[in-house]
Amino acid sequence: MKRELEETRRQGTAMRPLQVYHMRCDPGAIDVPFHWHENAEILLMQTGTLALQVEAVPFTGRPGDVFFINPRELHGMQSASADCAYLAIVFPLSWLQFALADEAEENCLRPLADRRARVTTRLDPA
């Protein structure tokens, strides 16, 4: 992982390390250059078209599409239409973990946190 591409911006506050970005960008503009961070990120497409790349895999986002970017995955976004708008929700994966050692924690959440598993990037409703 290239250290120089690590995003160092603090997300939210110490008490609430969640940041929601309302993104509206010019077509063809590089809205978010390639970077990675320790947090998980959810992108929710609202309008227009977005070109995004996650770990060298290209995706096209359209209204209603949801993308999950795992912690430490290299990613970047670029508007592909004049009316491109999306929400980017950045949060620590630990928010999904519980203090209990239950089956969901052991089989699903801990492997995500330890990078032994990952959530697929494009979440399809069907």
Predicted regions and their residues:
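Conserved short histidine dyad/triad with adjacent acidic residue
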Residues: V20-H37
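A hydrophobic/aromatic-rich effector-binding and dimerization subdomain
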Residues: M1-Q19, L74-A126
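Tight coil/turn sites that cap or link beta-strands
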Residues: G28-A29, G64, R72, P92-S94
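Structural motif
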Residues: T49-A51, P58, L74, W95
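A generic fold-level signal
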Residues: T13-M15, H37, Q53, G61, ...
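Short acidic-glycine-tyrosine-enriched beta hairpin
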Residues: A56-P71
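Short, conserved beta-strand element in jelly-roll/cupin
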Residues: H35-Q53, F68
